[in-house]
Design a protein with these regions (language model features):
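Hydrophobic side chains within well-formed alpha-helices
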Residues: 5, 19, 23, 35, ...
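N-terminal signal-anchor/first transmembrane alpha helix
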Residues: 1-16, 46, 50, 68, ...
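Membrane-water interface segments at the C-terminal ends of transmembrane alpha-helices
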Residues: 17, 24-29, 93-129, 157-163
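Alpha-helical transmembrane segments of integral membrane proteins
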Residues: 53-86, 102, 130-284
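Hydrophobic alpha-helical transmembrane segments of membrane transport/permease proteins
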Residues: 1-24, 117-144
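Amphipathic alpha-helical recognition patches that constitute DNA-binding helices
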Residues: 18, 22, 26, 44, ...
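Short, hydrophobic secondary-structure boundary micro-motifs
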Residues: 21, 36-39, 105-106, 121, ...
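An internal, D/E-rich "acidic patch" concept
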Residues: 15-72
Length: 284
């Protein structure tokens, strides 16, 4: 590379300016949603990253909703029936789920699906990719169904792996809440067990979980991790790994910036939810 080319690139990206001017230029571009220009893809970073974010949302949003809908009741039931057969079975499965990496679980499910296909000729769910061949010729609803069909296996993997940890946390919080004096007082007053559990114990047990909701939004950027790589899902993680291997600085920095912004938004939402869940918190 000639010195003239280096000087031109430094001027193009503002690297010849003082540090404070570079920072102000970066803030100006960030406020205008300009995350830079990709060297590898020869396109603005936002145009490259945003479609991948949407693809990851197809997996992350449903798996997060299913996580709360399944893991919370499982944790509550485990706390109410502590050391019962069902609690022991669920605890064993939870520890097993924590021990198995989600990408390895994806490989196991892919193997089982392929075995069913080889034996019966029926492909229960696609094992890779996001769309079928001829996708562009499909109608709108056919496209929706096709993407949803391809998303089933990775969503099952993500939900199963996350349920293990979340249900254990929910169970522990419920056990602690059920041992508190206010629960014994509520029972002594003759309140129905349903009211004691769901209005008093659960509402307090869920507070630490709500406080950690702020960390969920950045997962929309981090995506489904290696599950996307294993299942060839065109999400965030494959693009990030490709950008790192090609030293595409602005794409990597764009990921980090979007993750930081979503983390701040998530923390704000968790604070607002805490005020709704916990009556002791009031914002003036």
């Amino acid at each position: 590379v000639t010195p003239e080319t280096i000087a031109r690139l430094r001027a193009q990206f503002g690297l010849d300016r003082p540090f404070h001017e570079q920072y102000l230029l970066w803030m100006h571009n960030l406020l205008h949603l300009n995350l830079g220009y990709s060297f590898a893809y020869q396109a603005p970073v936002l145009e490259i990253v945003w479609p991948r974010v949407l693809n990851s949302m197809v997996l992350v949003v449903p798996s997060t909703v299913l996580l709360f809908l399944i893991a919370a009741p499982v944790g509550v039931c485990g706390a109410l029936r502590q050391y019962s057969l069902g609690d022991r079975v669920v605890s064993f499965l939870a520890y097993l789920g924590l021990a198995i990496p989600n990408f390895f679980l994806a490989l196991i499910l892919m193997y089982l699906v392929l075995q069913v296909y080889f034996r019966t000729g029926v492909m229960v769910f696609p094992v890779s990719g996001m769309t079928s061949s001829g996708f562009e010729q499909f109608s709108f609803w056919q496209k929706v169904v096709d993407v949803a069909w391809h998303a089933v296996l990775p969503i099952v993997v993500l939900t199963t792996s996350d349920i293990a940890g979340f249900s254990r946390i929910m169970r522990g919080q419920m056990l602690e809440a059920l041992s508190q004096d206010y629960v014994r007082t509520a029972r002594a007053k003759g309140l129905p067990e349903r009211v004691v559990v769901y209005k008093h114990a659960l509402r307090n047990a869920i507070i630490p979980i709500v406080a950690n909701i702020g960390g969920i939004l950045p997962t929309l950027i981090s995506g489904a991790g290696l599950v996307e790589v294993v299942t060839a899902w065109p999400g965030i993680t494959p693009l990030l790994l490709d950008a790192i291997s090609q030293q595409d600085l602005y794409v990597v920095a764009g990921f980090l910036t979007m993750g930081l912004v979503l983390l701040m938004i998530g923390n704000l939402l968790s604070d607002l939810l805490l005020a709704w869940v916990d009556p002791r918190i009031r914002y003036e």
